[in-house]
Design a protein with these regions (language model features):
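FAD cofactor-binding and catalytic pocket of flavoenzymes
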Residues: 16, 144, 310-434, 441, ...
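A conserved FAD-binding loop/helix module that cradles the flavin
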Residues: 515-534
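FAD-site-proximal beta/loop scaffold in flavoenzymes
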Residues: 481-505
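Glycine-rich loop(s) and the adjacent beta-strand/alpha-helix scaffold that form part
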Residues: 81-84, 88, 95-100, 105, ...
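Extreme N-terminal leader/targeting segments of oxidoreductases
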Residues: 1-30, 34-35, 39-66, 84-85, ...
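Residue-level detector of alpha-helix initiation sites
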Residues: 72-73, 297, 512
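Conserved redox-cofactor binding core of oxidoreductases
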Residues: 2-14, 20, 166-261, 270, ...
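N-terminal glycine-rich phosphate/pyrophosphate-binding loop and immediately adjacent elements
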Residues: 13, 47-159, 166-170, 309-331, ...
Length: 548
């Protein structure tokens, strides 16, 4: 059924990820959008308006109204919203342009081409935390699971109490609705749900726990479970197939394979950015407004390189620490068949714990489980009989992003004792659910821990202290390093992403979050970008993109 769904989708759509916005895309293109379609690296055709590193033969200099650094959830949304209002927008993306038809189940290739550092970023600490960032046109939305949830009301209330303006539920409602409409947010078609998700659901329900179907940005997902390698059908509504083509159709220009090195300034006002393509050619963009949406690691790094001075810049990193239990079943699970993460166990949200099942390709799984040599080989030999699941924790500790001479951008993170205890609790709960679903044994995410074969063994093992240094922790949700606050002493930007003390400079990604939100952050990023784009346009209509 899943493969039939995939074939039907491909036949119906032709894997076309052109402009999804209907009449809005009929507007005559401007600038580079009207030139002949070039061929990018590897000979692939790219849309009008996109310039890749393979197209560039010399240094380039361009002018625009707004330059956006980054093409992920925040950057692409901001670009599309501004372009729709008639603003001349240039988007710069460090990663490459990879169309839907180039995506396959080859996860090693995906790690090389779609992720920064091959998906092997590291926040140094005890334990160190492995993290992954997308680095391609569309950003991390190309390689995430497409989970789309509104910011929890309690989080918005906390932000409001901390003095962030216009982030109450009523304020954010129209932006959530717009984000969900633009990105086809809804429930998964039931025939595409895989057995790994069903097993976690069954085990949780057997224990009487609350389980909810996941809300995802998808349009009749085919259930190929290739989310982390790029959706091969275009059904996942990443920025690559939504806001990027929408912005291009409205006249925006996009330069891929180009790293922005610095934001240029004249006094307190920005004047644009400078950067280099992967093959060394320089790009200079002159613009009175710069929007930085490079993610919670690269955004503070770029701001710091560009002379932004704030006591909060690069601090307050939250990352929703995750860990994974590997459960072995007697019968085949074939977790790679079916949608990525179909359900969420929400029984323990008040404790700051969210439990999910997420099948991971072997190269990615190998990086986050404490199995080596023969044990790892045996695990992979049983790959078709395993369920990988685990907790996401709302962290209370924080980390920091720093530019260190000779070492580049470095990340540091402190897992607090309460957060470590929360993860251990999440591992025990996950194990209880999977044993209730019929698991025969489990590997736990702690170095040196033996396999457990019963709920009693699990309970007894975790009743003893688990050294933090032994924990295998990873993250895909990075946030908070350029947080919003009306008080420059407490935040890098104001409530709408305008950087304090610099005219024309904005932030539009999860760096803005004043703290962790305890849920997948993509829809929050999109909604805030839509909200902040509107405020930017209002300021522009008042005579300037940013008041002095």
């Amino acid at each position: 059924m899943i493969m039939a769904r995939k074939r039907h989708y491909l036949a119906k759509t032709g894997r076309d990820h052109g402009n999804p916005s209907g009449a809005a895309g009929e507007r005559a293109p401007r600038g580079d959008a009207g030139r002949q379609v070039p061929r990018g690296d590897a000979g692939r055709r790219v849309p009008r308006g996109v310039t890749t590193g393979g197209d560039v033969t010399g240094d380039l200099s361009v002018d625009c109204d707004v330059v956006v650094v980054g093409s992920g959830a925040g950057g692409a949304t901001m670009a599309a919203e501004l372009a729709e209002a008639g603003v001349d927008v240039v988007v710069i993306e460090e990663g490459g342009y990879h169309p839907t038809e180039s995506f396959t189940a080859d996860s090693m290739r995906a790690l090389r081409t779609l992720y920064r550092d091959g998906g092997g970023g590291m926040a140094v600490g005890r334990p160190s935390v492995l993290f992954a960032e997308g680095r391609c046109v569309g950003g991390s939305t190309v390689v995430n699971g497409g989970m789309s949830w509104r910011t929890p009301a309690r989080v918005l209330e906390r932000w409001s109490a901390e003095g962030v303006l216009a982030v109450g539920e009523r304020d954010m409602e129209p932006y959530f609705e717009r984000a969900e409409s633009r990105h086809s947010v809804g429930l998964q078609d039931p025939e595409t749900i895989g057995r790994d998700s069903e097993l976690l659901k069954a085990g949780a329900q057997a224990r009487g726990w609350a389980v909810v179907p996941n809300r995802r940005s998808q349009l009749h997902c085919a259930g190929t479970n290739n989310c982390s390698s790029g959706c091969p059908t275009g059904a996942k509504r990443s920025m690559l197939v939504t806001s990027v083509p929408r912005a291009l159709a409205l006249g925006a220009r996009l330069y891929a394979d180009c790293r922005v090195d610095r934001i240029t300034r004249a006094g307190r006002a920005v004047t644009g950015v400078t950067g280099r393509f992967a093959r060394g050619q320089a790009l200079t963009v002159r613009a009175p407004t710069v929007v930085v949406a490079a993610g919670a690691i690269q955004t503070p790094a770029l701001l710091a390189r560009s002379g932004v001075r704030s006591g909060q810049l690069g601090r307050n990193l939250a990352l929703h620490p995750n860990t994974t239990v590997v459960a072995f079943f007697d019968s085949e699970v074939t977790g790679w068949q079916g949608v990525h993460q179909a359900f969420q166990v929400r029984e323990f949200m008040a404790e700051g714990l969210l439990l999910t099942a997420q099948n991971l390709p072997p190269p990615m799984l190998a990086g986050i489980v404490p199995a080596y040599g023969r044990e790892l080989g045996e695990l992979m030999a049983d790959y078709n009989r395993i369920v990988t699941a685990g907790p996401l924790a709302t962290d209370t500790g924080t980390g920091r992003v720093r530019n260190i001479p000779g070492l580049g951008t470095q990340v540091f993170y402190r897992l607090t004792d309460p957060d470590a205890a929360r993860l251990v609790r999440g591992v025990e709960l996950t194990g209880q659910a999977l044993f209730a679903a019929g698991a025969r044994r489990m590997l736990l995410p702690f170095d040196g821990a033996p396999a457990v074969r019963s709920p009693g063994e699990l309970r007894n093992l975790l009743a003893r202290p688990v050294p933090k240094a032994s924990m295998q922790v990873y993250s895909i949700h990075l946030m908070g390093t350029a947080r919003m606050s009306e008080d420059p002493r407490r935040g890098v930007t104001d409530s709408f992403g305008a950087v304090h003390g610099v005219r024309g400079l904005f932030v539009a990604d999860a760096s803005l979050f004043p703290g962790p939100i305890g849920i997948n952050p993509m829809e929050t990023v999109i909604a805030l970008a839509m909200r902040n784009a509107r405020r930017l346009l209002e300021r522009r209509a008042d005579g300037g993109l940013l008041p002095g």
